[in-house]
Amino acid sequence: MYLYIETLKQRLDAINQLRVDRALAAMGPAFQQVYSLLPTLLHYHHPRMPGYLDGNVPKGICLYTPDETQRHYLNELELYRGMSVQDPPKGELPITGVYTMGSTSSVGQSCSSDLDIWVCHQSWLDSEERQLLQRKCSLLESWAASLGVEVSFFLIDENRFRHNESGSLGGEDCGSTQHILLLDEFYRTAVRLAGKRILWNMVPCDEEEHYDDYVMTLYAQGVLTPNEWLDLGGLSSLSAEEYFGASLWQLYKSIDSPYKAVLKTLLLEAYSWEYPNPRLLAKDIKQRLHDGEIVSFGLDPYCMMLERVTEYLTAIEDFTRLDLVRRCFYLKVCEKLSRERACVGWRRAVLSQLVSEWGWDEARLAMLDNRANWKIDQVREAHNELLDAMMQSYRNLIRFARRNNLSVSASPQDIGVLTRKLYAAFEALPGKVTLVNPQISPDLSEPNLTFIYVPPGRANRSGWYLYNRAPNIESIISHQPLEYNRYLNKLVAWAWFNGLLTSRTRLYIKGNGIVDLPKLQEMVADVSHHFPLRLPAPTPKALYSPCEIRHLAIIVNLEYDPTAAFRNQVVHFDFRKLDVFSFGENQNCLVGSVDLLYRNSWNEVRTLHFNGEQSMIEALKTILGKMHQDAAPPDSVEVFCYSQHLRGLIRTRVQQLVSECIELRLSSTRQETGRFKALRVSGQTWGLFFERLNVSVQKLENAIEFYGAISHNKLHGLSVQVETNHVKLPAVVDGFASEGIIQFFFEETQDENGFNIYILDESNRVEVYHHCEGSKEELVRDVSRFYSSSHDRFTYGSSFINFNLPQFYQIVKVDGREQVIPFRTKSIGNLPPANQDHDTPLLQQYFS
């Protein structure tokens, strides 16, 4: 036994040293400096060293002895700065070990890779000491960033995984209850920089079910010494719920970084395919270590992940996704094999061998190596391919849930956040601008863009066509348009938000008299000035809340301008009665078309078009209907006007009208249900009525009808039906109502006799059920199951995608005031919070 253990320790140390050497060899001097000095900076604490702060900051790493590089650094400090570094006191030190995890030291580590560091500490550190250590780590992150190296520290209590502590998708965590999968990744990718060896590696795979007993036997026999090992626990069996939660989180991460996430997504899918008897990859690597089979290029965790995914996809004969995952792997490794290198490193040698096995030719390598120069056609093809792969994983995940009798509402808040993010990123809707470049190519800019209008009655359908070339007949005739839409606003928005249209792009337009080049250039300048391309990703809180309009542009008279008729005409009007909506003797409306362009709190970009005399009324009703009553006002509201005449007057009047209506919509209360705005358009009077859940429009022919409409709205206020005429919705439900979403609100009754349910459908029609009995959890599960199965809403197809599942809320009282919070099942809601004092937020780097 003793010789066996000693052999294992030697293999462990050899593999660990190999990984350290590989991590350093792949990176530049700044990374090497940070990587080498981090243990020293955590072991010591001195004012002249990075990371210093006042207070009783825990210092000292168990079993740490500075190596030659670290000793040289300390000697330099003593020699040139005249400082004396004191060793921490003897005995059990507070930091049990410092480890990297993730792609560092693997073939997947690239020149742009960041560092994820686990700082494992003793469980006896108190709350204040943990906070001080966390602050020191934050200072070290800033120090590394100043050198151009991205480092993320995670404080890990050595007993954390034994306590089954959990977080949620909304925090700096990896969703609901994913401890075993997190340990799986740590155990297969960890590199010890300093401190104790990892005990789990010493326990044979066939003893995993009796992990603690086997460890105690080793200690009792004196084969191992307890205080020399980091023990985070064994890899026990995984629940179906954990696979489901982990896969949700991985899909969530993959939306923003699809190439980076494909491999991990498919590893989880492979695990679920083998369920209930999966072979965790960490166990596979450990078995190879115990058997002395140092395969896969030194048990490289990234290569072994590819090997497992390849095995799975080959078994299910999914060669399309197998080809995709190989390309993702190649791009992640970032060794351009089509270009000659004087020095052939180990990563290049590994990749060359794999590419040879895959049978790739030079043309494919050149295409992949040219990714930085991919333009819209290649990017759109890649986007569709990644989307198909992601939706296939999503479908398989839901099938796994059904096969194992899991409710998709096991954690309704998590799935709510994920479905909203999928909905925002991928649901194809009329007027929505699809963003096709999620970190696929760095630059889609085009030197030339041409917009061509085809009027009705031609062979091609009427509308606008966009080409990425100058408008000569040969180039246009022989090429397909990049994009088509009936309205110019949508095409300009698509080109701008996808990065094709920049300040350097030459614009051309064949507008058939509708829009000329100066007007197009004005619009492009306005949109680019008021709508930044890069914004922070929406927070989980924003995704779980009803979407709110953040940036709004109202574009007036872009495609149809009534004032163009004023040219060479005498127009009679009274300067004292300059009403642009009912202008001059003929009371003409000077607003002929309105385009809306807005970005919401989910970072969706939407466009809408209205034309004709009623375009202003229709646009107002539509945009106000998208603002729920408790929404924050938009961050910006801009009016762009492109009239030939009276431009300033029209813009000012529209701006005043829109601002006034938004104020009326967002300030309306239940006590003021009769608020309205009268507007005269083309000689006719219209009333905009600001009701609790929406905005209605009514034509008012005469004074009696006008007064009657106002009185009716004052008395009743609601245009929707409830259970009885006497039932009133709670104010918080009114404020949370959001069109396009099915919402369930649970409210405990005052006499504690059951609960009430308020249901708002996509059009904000209301149903109310009083004194319900039974289990809310079962209701949530059944409703979620119905919606996920009846419309196959989790399935991607060419004709229909709908990720927008019903949302569930609980009405609670906090300090005497009613509030709406996400409904959580008891099994989830009673878990400890993710951010207790003794807990570092864990772990954004899992599945990153």
UniProtKB/Swiss-Prot annotation:
<keyword id="KW-0597">Phosphoprotein</keyword>
<feature type="region of interest" description="Catalytic">
    <location>
        <begin position="1"/>
        <end position="535"/>
    </location>
</feature>
<dbReference type="GO" id="GO:0005524">
    <property type="term" value="F:ATP binding"/>
</dbReference>
<comment type="similarity">
    <text>Belongs to the adenylyl cyclase class-1 family.</text>
</comment>
<keyword id="KW-0547">Nucleotide-binding</keyword>
<dbReference type="GO" id="GO:0004016">
    <property type="term" value="F:adenylate cyclase activity"/>
</dbReference>
<feature type="region of interest" description="Regulatory">
    <location>
        <begin position="541"/>
        <end position="848"/>
    </location>
</feature>
<dbReference type="Pfam" id="PF12633">
    <property type="entry name" value="Adenyl_cycl_N"/>
</dbReference>
<keyword id="KW-0963">Cytoplasm</keyword>
<dbReference type="Pfam" id="PF01295">
    <property type="entry name" value="Adenylate_cycl"/>
</dbReference>
<dbReference type="GO" id="GO:0006171">
    <property type="term" value="P:cAMP biosynthetic process"/>
</dbReference>
<dbReference type="InterPro" id="IPR024685">
    <property type="entry name" value="Adenylate_cyclase_1_N"/>
</dbReference>
<keyword id="KW-0067">ATP-binding</keyword>
<protein>
    <recommendedName>
        <fullName>Adenylate cyclase</fullName>
        <ecNumber>4.6.1.1</ecNumber>
    </recommendedName>
</protein>
<feature type="modified residue" description="Phosphohistidine; by CRR">
    <location>
        <position position="609"/>
    </location>
</feature>
<dbReference type="GO" id="GO:0005737">
    <property type="term" value="C:cytoplasm"/>
</dbReference>
<dbReference type="InterPro" id="IPR024686">
    <property type="entry name" value="Adenylate_cyclase_1_CS"/>
</dbReference>
<keyword id="KW-0456">Lyase</keyword>
<dbReference type="InterPro" id="IPR000274">
    <property type="entry name" value="Adenylate_cyclase_1"/>
</dbReference>
<keyword id="KW-0115">cAMP biosynthesis</keyword>
